[in-house]
C-alpha cells in the first residue's frame, strides 16, 4: 500500500493505481483507454466522497496526524506575503517546537505563532515532535505582548499532541507557563484568532488557543487528552483508543455543535495534505474575513465579547 494512504483509504488507492496502469498502457501505439479512465475517475470520485462522508472519529484523527499534512511552516509560505521569524523567550532558550514572528497577510501586519512538528527524523528531534517546553510558551507570550504593544492582531496555528511532559520541562515550570498564557491571552488588547490545523492536544494546544475566534480545519481534532492516553487511564488499555476517540468528541463538527468552535473550514477532497495550497488559500480567506470583523470593534468591545465567550464554555440547561 502506498504510504501516503491510510488504511481506510485502500479502495481509493486501488482505483488510483488502476487509473495509472491504464494511462501507462495508453502510451503504447494504437491503444485508447480514455473511456475506461473516465469511468474509473467517476468511480473514484464517488468512492472518495462516500468514504469521507462516513469517517469515524478515529479515522479523522489519522488524517489530523497524517505525515504529509501541512504544518505551520507550510501555511506561512503560502498564506503570508512576508514573514520574519523571532526567536527566544529572553529567559532560557529558543524552543523550536514553537515558531512565530511578524508577518503580512494581504498587506496587513500581524503576529503569527504556531506549533511546528517536523518532517524527517532530524527535524522532528529539532522541533521536539511539536511538543513545546516552557520556553516555547514563554516565547509565544513574548511575541503576543509585542503584538499588543504595536497593535497587531495575533494569529495562532495549533498542531501538537500536547505539551512536553519531561522532567526538564516540569522543573522549569511547564504548568505555570501554560497557565500564564491562558491568563494573558484572555486579557490581550488586540484581536486573537486561533486555528487548529492538525492535532489540538490538551493544555499544550490551549496555551495558544484562547482568543476571540476559534477556527478548525475539517479534519483537525481538539481534545483534553489523546485517545491513547484516555484509554490507558480509563480502561488500562491503550488498544481501546478507537473507543476513546468516539467518546472524546474531538472532531470539528462535534465541537462546533457544542459552541467551542466558531467556524469549520472545509478541506480539499481527501484532506489538507492532498492539496496544501488550496487549503492554505481557503484558510487565508476565512482569517481575513474574521480579522475584518474583529478590527471594527473597540478594545472594550473586543475584551467584553472575549470574556463573554470564555464564560459561556461548559454552560448547560438542566432538564
Curated annotation (Swiss-Prot):
Gene Ontology biological-process entries: fatty acid biosynthetic process; malonyl-CoA biosynthetic process
Statement: the UniProt record of this protein carries the keyword Transferase: yes
UniProt keyword list: ATP-binding, Cytoplasm, Fatty acid biosynthesis, Fatty acid metabolism, Lipid biosynthesis, Lipid metabolism, Nucleotide-binding, Transferase
Annotated GO CC locations: acetyl-CoA carboxylase complex
CoA carboxyltransferase C-terminal domain segment(s): 38-293
Catalytic activity reported: N(6)-carboxybiotinyl-L-lysyl-[protein] + acetyl-CoA = N(6)-biotinyl-L-lysyl-[protein] + malonyl-CoA
Subunit record text: Acetyl-CoA carboxylase is a heterohexamer composed of biotin carboxyl carrier protein (AccB), biotin carboxylase (AccC) and two subunits each of ACCase subunit alpha (AccA) and ACCase subunit beta (AccD).
Protein name: Acetyl-coenzyme A carboxylase carboxyl transferase subunit alpha
Species: Stenotrophomonas maltophilia (strain R551-3)
